[in-house]
């Protein structure tokens, strides 16, 4: 966290997700051995993290804050976005940064008439519903959903 920036009318929050190749047991083979640019999924995960945490900072807070979530290990079967969001919330909560958290997030899928909590990539491909909810003890902070044609009652139940 830096000192407050003068002359800006927004909260300068930067969220980065670093997906390291060593997390899945690979070492880049190029001459420079660099990790490269973030993937589209990493960019979408950064946005997923930013949306629910941004409103939990105090109004008028102008200090620049950078949040970097680094993948240390991955089984390549479980999406990392929910884990990263919960990790960021935990880190901000225990830091000295003024943050009105914590918040918790989960993803729900719906396969064969049953809800699946934090489904794998394979289960998400079969799922009729993909809904992510992030909330604090006071209420929902962010909800993101994607679905095929599905009954409204199922969405409400999720």
Show where each model-derived region lies.
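N-terminal start-of-chain detector that recognizes signal peptides
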Residues: 38-43, 77-81, 103-106, 113-116
